[in-house]
Amino acid sequence: MLKQIQKFLKLEAASGILLLVSALLAMIFANTDLNQLYFSFLQTEVAIKFGAFSIDKPLLMWVNDGFMAVFFILVGMEVKRELFEGSLSSYQKAIFPAVAALGGMIIPALVYWFINQNSPEYQQGWAIPMATDIAFALGIVALLSKQVPPALKVFLLALAIIDDLGAIIVIALFFSHEMSMQALTIASIAIVILVAMNRYKVTGLINYAIIGTILWASVLKSGVHATLAGVVIGFCIPLRGKNGEAPLHHLEHALAPWCSFAILPLFAFSNAGVSLEGMSLDKLASPLPLGVALGLIIGKPVGVFLFSYVAVLLGIAKVPEGINLKQIFAIAVLCGIGFTMSMFIAGLAFGEEDASESVLALARLGILMGTFVAAIIGYFLLKITTKPSLMKAA
């Protein structure tokens, strides 16, 4: 188990660095003479036709709806593995990070709502500061990897996975549009087939690829967000085959590098490019970016730590052996690194045709500000609280 976590941390840490580079490149492109090339490239129309069926979308939407669906397949598989075999496989293991994650979703949303309560045009962005970017957060942890207790890394992994699950539920419930019953019917049939394949332990991944593609296309046309198809596909991959094969492990192992080093950096490059032209301190201090930034910087750590502390106080959960509440607070601050999933939810909340590009830009700036501050403060707190001398004293 520990070796798997260490291997995962190395992968995610490198991915976190690449995400940062991709985001910086996007900001450079968006704020130099290359900005026209950058934005026009993202709006390039790409069409796929199959008889009467066609999907015609800008390149940016293919990244957000298509490539990110592959990432969500990985998320679905990770959640399933942790629920059945890993750090969430029993009540005792799951309750502490689950309560922490719940606080880390509720309090940031409340902070955002409080700041934007008099700005109805911004209120649909309440879910933006709820998410944690596991790649960025683990990238920071990896910088101090030698002195960070393994139990603390497991806690962060479990919390981030539950966070992802919460984000998936939020997307499903609050960011779906007008429904197409025909497309939903096709999607439902595809899901039934996938569940049956899982039930009868079909291990041929090509079968899941074919039915999964049909599911993704029908969900895309249905009005439900297409990335949710990825989660369903991930959950339907069997953990074990009839002859002891491990299809979920094999697919997870195959997809993880592609997601970490191609899909997520591409998503970051496509979505982090915010033009600062016309921006002012007044705009940066307006309710939208302020709500997002403070939701991440204040709401996240307060929510994660407060709910954890109360759970321990009431005897609902116990602090995992080998770590202390000071270290939990440091991790809680790192949970304010919301980059990837926050950008994704911001695109759903403000990226539609009825929302202006400047509103989405303000949301993204709030995410960048909040993520940067949370990363810096979280790093120093983690460094201080995991010093060997303090560990012995604790």
Swiss-Prot record:
The keyword Transport applies. It catalyses: Na(+)(in) + 2 H(+)(out) = Na(+)(out) + 2 H(+)(in). One of its GO terms (biological process) is regulation of pH. Keywords: Antiport, Cell inner membrane, Cell membrane, Ion transport, Membrane, Sodium, Sodium transport, Transmembrane, Transmembrane helix, Transport. Its main location: membrane. Pfam families: Na_H_antiport_1. Belongs to the NhaA Na(+)/H(+) (TC 2.A.33) antiporter family. This is Na(+)/H(+) antiporter NhaA. It comes from Actinobacillus pleuropneumoniae serotype 7 (strain AP76).
